[in-house]
Amino acid sequence: MLTNYLLIIFCFLALFCSFMIIASKNPIHSILYLILVFCNVTFVLIILGVEFIAIIFLIVYVGAIAVLFLFVVMMLNIKILELDEVFWRYIPAGLLISSCFLFQLFTFVFNFSVVEVFGLFFYNGFYSINKLALNFSEIHTVPSGLLINGIYIFPNLSNLGIDQVFINSIYKEESFFCFVKLNEASTNLLGLSFELTNTEILGWLVYTYTFFIFLVVSLILLISMIGSIILVLNQNINIKRQVIFRQSLRDLKSSVSLKN
């Protein structure tokens, strides 16, 4: 119950800060509200159990992009805009776009099941399903390939002879119990205890199955970094540079000479 209240509070705070981004006259205040939006969304993701994306929000958006925007705006001499007719002229267009977005959101929510709405599309048909999003009074049919709470994966259900996976309405001691429906129409009960986090399962996937792609991407980034450094280096050989060793060996007699 406390989790639901915290989720609602952070969602409303994120909506309020989002409105204040466009309502603030001072651009510095707008960027500060943008940072607050990212922080509130981070707390929402942590409550939903998606801690890896929450960390990415803090590191990338808050720690890099938003702070960069803040310093750029503070360095530039931007005048504070007044709320005049030019500002209010764009209110109808903003309301129209917001209405279209909300209509699509509610249509998506009411046309899909709870698992499909809160399930995070992960990779090649995998769905990340958080235990908060599951309605334990029902049994949901989940698409092939499953990542429950970012923890366990059925890599290829068709090869295992499995048509569908049913999540039973049993939740006890941090364990999920799944009914697996086989092609032979027989049903087995699997008691699966999940202890890994989203970050651990992502690290396992990256460094186990996609480690070669990960290394190739790292080498490409390294080459691009070295190439950018080489491009900005000054290759002019006529530039006079100091020789620290020769300067250290000089004394007063060899440095100063008197001429008539």
Swiss-Prot record:
Top enzyme class: translocase
Gene Ontology annotations for the cellular component aspect, listed alphabetically: mitochondrial membrane
Entry keyword set: Electron transport, Membrane, Mitochondrion, NAD, Respiratory chain, Translocase, Transmembrane, Transmembrane helix, Transport, Ubiquinone
Subcellular location field: Mitochondrion membrane
Record membrane topology: Multi-pass membrane protein
Membrane-crossing segments per the record: 2-22, 30-50, 52-72, 101-121, 142-162, 211-231
Superkingdom of source: Eukaryota
EC number(s) on file: 7.1.1.2
Reaction equation(s) it catalyzes: a ubiquinone + NADH + 5 H(+)(in) = a ubiquinol + NAD(+) + 4 H(+)(out)
GO molecular function: NADH dehydrogenase (ubiquinone) activity
Function as written in the Swiss-Prot or TrEMBL entry: Core subunit of the mitochondrial membrane respiratory chain NADH dehydrogenase (Complex I) that is believed to belong to the minimal assembly required for catalysis. Complex I functions in the transfer of electrons from NADH to the respiratory chain. The immediate electron acceptor for the enzyme is believed to be ubiquinone.
Family: Belongs to the complex I subunit 6 family.
Protein name according to UniProt: NADH-ubiquinone oxidoreductase chain 6
Species this protein is from: Acanthamoeba castellanii (Amoeba)
Gene: ND6
